[in-house]
Regions:
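Non-catalytic, solvent-exposed segments at the cell envelope interface
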Residues: 2-521
Length: 521
């Protein structure tokens, strides 16, 4: 597959004699603080708030927890909250070999909308009880996948519907519910294979559940950063007609219907812009749900429960959902992360591209490489090793060879995986045979060499992205503060051994550079 070469510069140059290009860093969105309340309702408040904090990260799953919370509240108000939560009515969640529970979260339409069973929201949430982290990875609905021999290749959002329809065609005796259960299983299996991680559960909510939840909390406030004009929004009656939807810039109050339209619209923007708006809406729901007026009101809590109704589907048992409540206290706001796959090779998660299409063909996305290997490594990194990015380590990438473009190609490569490369350029020496990795900030701070390289981010990078060279135990003269200024914690001085490694793994370096050894030029 073909890629393309781009460049991006953030700010000015350091006083070093050799130009170094600074880079724009990715942003992590975290959840807010938990409110406090006294007495019995403090216990209820803490329980529900914890799970609405989760809703900003794993919204669909939170709906199930709210459902369980209301059942606990209505069935056993006279019992101690702690006694209920830690009772035998909870079952531990399934986990992988790393102790993570991975849940596929889905958002679909409803019977009144075209494509009612298209999964337009696909998210994998990974819960690590031991470290108290929740990491979420969004998969674009337009990702092109092979469904089966009959349907061939299609967008992943159609997999559930096509599988269920095929099941009902092949087995006329089964019910529609059984057919869609099979569809959920196949979709879960497909996402698991794409990401190369086990997925233990799925959970799905539809448009009705979404709008009713917003209405149940009396609307939400959203700060609209850019005016949205969509003359092609689907009509409310589910017909082939359109309606015009417009939202102006500024703080807006949305009811359920308007919030849904704001989150769904994409005809005049893009799928990725829509994903950003969806995050805005989910955050607004969470903020409103955290307000005392909602969480301390049994009536409003009951409205939330009633809004869920049949609009929520999951293979999580009620006992497992109660177990989620049991472990909720382990998850703090600064241990919750959200990522997404996209088609911008200069951004974190930018492993996809839009192939040319014939007139009338649907928009689709494919991986830059002919397999899911880099997407799988990314999923492993962000879902199973969130501590890597939590370390906050910064890097400077330097080309120590005569091969042009090594630093810039490595820059793009590392940015796609979310590493914070603050500068890149040429090394003082352009004839470096063996890559050198300098833990600059640690050594300058007086740390021992062992302590300076004891870093989760650096360890993962050396194992998976820069698997050549060696680490330096002291700061060379050319990189001393007198001779060289760097904003980075780690300096990566790339040598000829790294160029040779690039040649063997050239498919990951988008730009079609021809890598050959210097000796063979």
């Amino acid at each position: 597959m073909n890629g393309f070469t781009t460049k991006k510069i953030r700010k000015g140059l350091p006083p070093s004699k050799i130009p170094q290009k600074p880079i724009q860093k990715p942003e992590i969105v975290l959840s807010p603080d938990e409110p406090q309340k006294k007495g019995f309702w403090k216990k209820i408040l803490r329980f529900i708030t914890r799970h609405f904090i989760w809703s900003a990260i794993i919204f669909v799953l939170c709906i199930g927890v709210t459902k369980a919370a209301y059942r606990v509240l209505t069935l056993a108000e006279d019992f101690s909250f702690k006694e209920l939560v830690f009772s035998a009515f909870s079952n531990p969640l399934e986990t992988d070999e790393n102790g993570h529970t991975n849940i596929l979260l889905l958002g679909t339409g409803n019977a009144n909308h075209d494509g009612a069973n298209l999964t337009d929201t696909i998210i994998v949430a990974s819960i690590d009880k031991s470290s108290g982290t929740v990491a979420m990875l969004s998969i674009p609905r337009d990702l092109y996948v092979e469904i089966d021999a009959l349907y061939g290749w299609n967008r992943i959002n159609s997999l559930l519907e096509l599988t269920a329809q095929q099941e009902m065609y092949d087995n006329p005796a089964i019910t529609e519910g059984q057919a869609y259960t099979k569809g959920y299983e196949i979709l879960t299996q497909t996402v698991s294979e794409i990401l190369n991680i086990p997925i233990h559960y799925y959970a799905r909510i539809n448009f009705d559940g979404f709008t009713q939840i917003v209405d149940a909390i009396e609307g939400i406030d959203v700060d609209v950063e850019e005016a949205l004009y969509d003359p092609l929004y689907p009509a409310d009656d589910g017909s082939i007609a359109y309606q015009t939807f417009f939202v102006d810039v500024g703080l807006q109050h949305f009811d359920g219907d308007t919030a849904l339209k704001y989150a769904r619209s994409r005809e005049t923007t893009s799928d990725f812009s829509r994903s950003k708006r969806q995050q805005q809406v989910l955050n607004a729901i969470k903020e409103k749900a955290l307000s005392l007026g909602v969480l301390t009101s049994p009536t409003k809590l009951k409205n939330l429960y009633n809004a869920i109704g049949d609009n929520f589907t999951s293979d999580l048992t009620w006992e497992e959902i109660v177990y989620l409540a049991k472990i909720a206290d382990k998850f703090e706001r600064d241990h919750m992360y959200s990522w997404g796959l996209n088609d911008n090779p200069l951004s974190m998660g930018g492993f996809l591209y839009t192939p040319p299409r014939e007139e009338g063909d649907a928009f689709s996305l494919l991986p830059y490489v002919n397999d899911y290997s880099d997407i799988q490594l990314f999923a492993n990194l962000v879902l199973l090793h969130p501590e890597v990015h939590a370390a906050g380590t910064t890097y400077q990438v330097l080309n120590g060879t005569t091969r042009n473009g090594v630093a810039s190609q490595t820059l793009y490569y590392l940015i796609r995986f979310g590493f914070d490369v603050v500068r890149y350029g040429n090394a003082p020496n352009r004839a470096v045979p063996i890559t050198r990795i300098l833990p600059l900030s640690g050594l300058l701070a007086g740390q021992s060499p062992e302590k300076a390289i004891d870093n989760d981010s650096l360890k993962f990078l050396m194992e998976n992205f820069i698997p050549v060279g060696f680490t330096l135990n002291d700061v060379p003269t050319e990189y001393s503060p007198v001779e060289w200024e760097s904003e980075a914690d780690i300096v990566l001085e790339l040598g000829q051994d790294y160029v040779d490694w690039m040649a063997q793994n050239s498919k990951y370096f988008y730009g079609n550079l021809k890598f050959t050894s210097i000796e063979n030029q």
